[in-house]
Amino acid sequence: MIDKKKVNRNFSKGAKTYDEYALIQRHMADKLGIFIEDSEEVFNILEIGCGTGIFSEKILNKFPNSNIDFLDISHDMIKNVKDKIGSKENLNFIVEDIEKYQPQKKYDLIFSNATFQWIQNKKGLFDHLDSFLKPGGLILFSTFGKDTYFELRESLKSIDPDLEYSQNFISLEDLKKVLDDKYKILAAEEERIKENYHCVMDFLKMIKGIGANSALSNSKPFTRDKFNRLEDEYRKNYCSGDSIEVTNHLIYMILGKNY
């Protein structure tokens, strides 16, 4: 079970260092941005999990005259994006959990970059979004797929089956299954990008730097012995030269709401 209070706390702590470490999230934003190049001007837009504004700037550049709501669970993240893009009459900044969000309007477009992996109930999420997406409206999002950080999960499992520091990510196939007849899948792509880190500590430092350290409510602290064993186990199976390998499984989708 994902602890939303811990998610909020972790991302608030990572707000100042997010841009420094969020290389993959920036790549995802760039690729997601390609999908909006041919989009026409619309009236109401929502961005879910705006973070520090990596994707927010792309939305604003493409739709400068639209009414745009930027939403994030972390007050510190919202402060960052507000400082970055500035206050304008057509922009609204909202601190809220998307699963609790009850807008008094309907949206033409809903965007989300690298956020939906923090939502446990994916079917509930898309049912909820349907309630405030206009007929014919679009949802464009990127998220992390099931093979993300599989090296870490397998290494943890090897040293202690009870240790779990990475939430379970969803496959593209399972993601498609939670979508019912409310939506039409207009595009679905996935890619895998490998990163290299000097050691497990550097990898975990990156995760902490973007505020993505484990939000599982049953996560346990490491002992020094277990951390050393984790480093050894990881290097034994997922080493490339002097570095360790880390897999990022990235999913991109465009959904159209049926009339």
UniProtKB/Swiss-Prot annotation:
Q: In which pathway does it act?
A: Cofactor biosynthesis; biotin biosynthesis
Write down the top EC class of this protein. transferase
Reactions accelerated catalytically? malonyl-[ACP] + S-adenosyl-L-methionine = malonyl-[ACP] methyl ester + S-adenosyl-L-homocysteine
Provide the alphabetized UniProt keywords. Answer: Biotin biosynthesis, Methyltransferase, Plasmid, S-adenosyl-L-methionine, Transferase
Q: What InterPro entries does UniProt report for this protein, alphabetically?
A: BioC, SAM-dependent_MTases_sf
The catalytic activity of this protein is classed by the Enzyme Commission as 2.1.1.197
Q: Name one Pfam family in it.
A: Methyltransf_23
Task: Spell out the molecular function terms from Gene Ontology.
Answer: carboxyl-O-methyltransferase activity; malonyl-CoA methyltransferase activity
Matching entries from CDD domains are given as: AdoMet_MTases
Described function: Converts the free carboxyl group of a malonyl-thioester to its methyl ester by transfer of a methyl group from S-adenosyl-L-methionine (SAM). It allows to synthesize pimeloyl-ACP via the fatty acid synthetic pathway.
Task: Give the protein's recorded name.
Answer: Malonyl-[acyl-carrier protein] O-methyltransferase 2
Q: Supply the source organism for this entry.
A: Ilyobacter polytropus (strain ATCC 51220 / DSM 2926 / LMG 16218 / CuHBu1)
